[in-house]
């Protein structure tokens, strides 16, 4: 299976087993006890869980997502990684995750890459107050999303810092500042467009989240976010927006686990004569239910605005929906099947620009323009066998994309191969 198909399988597994990490932080010293109990190794103040993952070993039947004359290749991706924690009594916890994707293609040397990534987080517990900060860095050649078919080197950075306060035993409020940065190499082009011209961006903002614990396993929440996007080479894309999203969170031990947030976003471009406005529904949902301890059903749904690399269609509304089933067969075997659909509904620029990606001159567009919609489907099946701290699996994944306007955007792809995860 390729990296993108494996990421999808990982999302299915996450929906089946874990709540949303971003919106279900516990912020208490019990995490320190959990780290000391579950870490695989302990040396001095350091607790660590190293692992090695064979993300894929198999065949990609359409390496470049080509509409015609697809080219196949044998591929492998190996990822050594480690989680490291440093507890400080019961007052603080430092955590970092480091790893590298080693991507290899047998025939297409241009698709090979080394993709390092690291994340870190620190929490300081002061009775009812928790101070936290985290950050992440990824330098990768893997595809940015399901729109950009080119494997292009880019750097993603993110940082967050904030405070969570327990006002009562059941009610807490959290506020945080956010920063994100995306940078593509300057010589990377797709369809004649330099990706750095349309995608290099910096996002700053803050969020305020209130949580009310209804039961030990269920929490109601409301999150408000204010965001500002600035583009290095395309200032006409600069914008401000806010999101208001009520939601509910369930801990893993609940009958239903995961989280669901549904709300409203208002997107306001700084140059409203060029970029279209958007206001409407946004959502982040990932829920799972386990039947009789052996069959787990998962559902995911996401809807939000995402920037496009296209000059004349600067962003799209991404509607993603998925369903998955995991069935345990005895103590060691399991079977996972999933189906996902991603719909990208593009918004047209209010002005015309040259196809070079350098929007230096503009002219008004005359007449109505049909909305472009691209749909990507993915069907995945995997059989796994657990060995100690690891899992060996064989998977098959079929991808299909159609577009109502761009025939050359359509493709299909059958991928199959082996995955191995082992924790030391």
Give the location of each predicted region.
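Bacterial N-terminal signal peptides that target proteins for export
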Residues: 1-10
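Gram-negative and organellar
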Residues: 24-424
């Amino acid at each position: 299976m390729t990296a993108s198909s494996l990421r999808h399988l990982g999302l299915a597994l996450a929906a089946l087993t874990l709540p949303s990490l971003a919106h279900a932080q516990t912020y208490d010293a019990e995490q320190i006890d959990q780290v000391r109990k579950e870490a695989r190794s302990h040396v001095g103040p350091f607790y660590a869980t190293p692992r090695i993952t064979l993300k894929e070993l198999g065949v990609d039947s359409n390496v470049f997502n080509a509409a015609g004359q697809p080219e196949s290749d044998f591929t492998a991706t190996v990822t050594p990684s480690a989680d490291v924690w440093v507890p400080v009594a019961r007052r603080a916890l430092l955590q970092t995750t480091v790893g590298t994707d080693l991507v290899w293609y047998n025939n297409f040397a241009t698709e090979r890459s080394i993709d390092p990534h690291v994340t870190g987080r620190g929490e300081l517990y002061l009775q009812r107050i928790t101070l936290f900060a985290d950050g992440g860095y990824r330098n990768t050649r893997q595809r940015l999303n399901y729109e950009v078919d080119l494997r292009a080197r880019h750097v993603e950075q993110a940082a967050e810092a904030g405070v969570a306060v327990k006002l009562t035993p059941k009610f807490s409020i959290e506020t945080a500042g956010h920063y994100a940065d995306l940078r593509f190499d300057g010589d990377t082009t797709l369809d004649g467009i330099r990706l750095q011209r349309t995608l290099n961006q910096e996002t700053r903002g803050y969020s305020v989240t209130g949580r009310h614990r209804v039961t030990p396993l269920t929490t109601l929440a409301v999150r408000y976010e204010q965001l500002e996007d600035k583009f290095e080479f395309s200032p006409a894309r600069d914008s401000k927006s806010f999101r208001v999203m009520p939601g509910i969170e369930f801990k893993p031990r609940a009958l239903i686990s995961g989280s669901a947030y549904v709300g409203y976003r208002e997107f306001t471009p700084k140059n409203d004569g060029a970029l279209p406005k958007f206001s409407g529904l946004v959502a982040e949902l990932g829920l799972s239910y386990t039947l009789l301890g052996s069959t787990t059903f998962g559902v995911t749904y996401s809807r939000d605005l995402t920037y496009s690399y296209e000059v004349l269609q600067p962003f799209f509304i991404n509607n993603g929906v998925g369903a998955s089933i995991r069935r345990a067969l005895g103590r060691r075997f399991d079977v996972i099947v999933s189906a996902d659909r991603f719909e990208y509904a593009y918004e047209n620029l209010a002005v015309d620009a040259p196809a070079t990606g350098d929007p230096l001159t503009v002219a008004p567009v005359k007449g109505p323009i049909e909305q472009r919609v691209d749909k990507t489907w993915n069907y995945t099946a995997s059989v796994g066998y657990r060995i100690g701290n690891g899992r060996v699996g064989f998977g098959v994944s079929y991808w299909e994309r159609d577009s109502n306007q761009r025939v050359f955007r359509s493709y299909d792809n059958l991928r199959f191969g082996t995955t191995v995860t082992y924790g030391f």
